[in-house]
């Protein structure tokens, strides 16, 4: 019962993390286009572009996952039915937050680790997210167990239905009668 009640809080933390990551992405983007080098700005370097692209992609993926989970909670009105996705966003949240915070610090250079910027606090916050409300590993186990429930009734462990042997057998069952009809028509 307590795990069910915590679901809303976990989604709320994930939404707040989306906001924090968005601020970090904005900060690193502003720094990239404003930090001058001899030939332009650091935004001109592919390594900086890759870090910004990775941060943008990870943030968008995480944001959409959080929105989907919130939509499913609204749809089902039952946290237990969305337990796997709630656990998944809880497990993913500290990694996304950590990776984006680390990139932001890196793009800011020594300024990023100074007490003039909030980024070290973000990095520490990401580590706290991985421990608070249950360690990430516990949530990953929940995701795996919930996911594997759909695969409990395996018919033949020696030759699963996706093996080439089984697929060929099904193809023969489906198409051999058609071949006989075609041959008879000729």
Report the location of each language-model feature:
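Alpha-helical interface subdomain recognition
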Residues: 3-186
């Amino acid at each position: 019962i307590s795990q069910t009640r915590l679901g809303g809080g976990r989604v709320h933390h994930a939404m707040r993390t989306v906001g924090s990551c968005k601020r970090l992405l904005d900060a690193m983007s502003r720094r990239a286009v404003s930090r001058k080098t001899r030939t332009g700005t650091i935004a001109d370097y592919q390594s900086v572009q890759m870090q910004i692209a990775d941060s943008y992609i990870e943030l968008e993926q995480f944001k959409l996952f959080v929105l989907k989970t919130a939509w499913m909670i609204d749809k089902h009105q039952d946290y237990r039915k969305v337990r796997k996705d709630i656990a998944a966003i809880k497990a993913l949240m500290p990694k996304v937050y950590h990776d984006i915070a680390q990139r932001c610090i890196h793009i800011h250079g020594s300024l990023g680790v100074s007490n003039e910027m909030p980024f070290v606090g973000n990095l520490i916050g990401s580590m706290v997210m991985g421990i608070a409300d249950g360690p990430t590993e516990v949530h990953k186990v929940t995701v795996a167990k919930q996911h594997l429930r759909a695969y409990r009734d395996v018919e033949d462990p020696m030759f699963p239905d996706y093996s080439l042997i089984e697929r060929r057998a099904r193809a023969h069952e489906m198409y051999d009668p058609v071949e006989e009809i075609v041959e008879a028509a000729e």
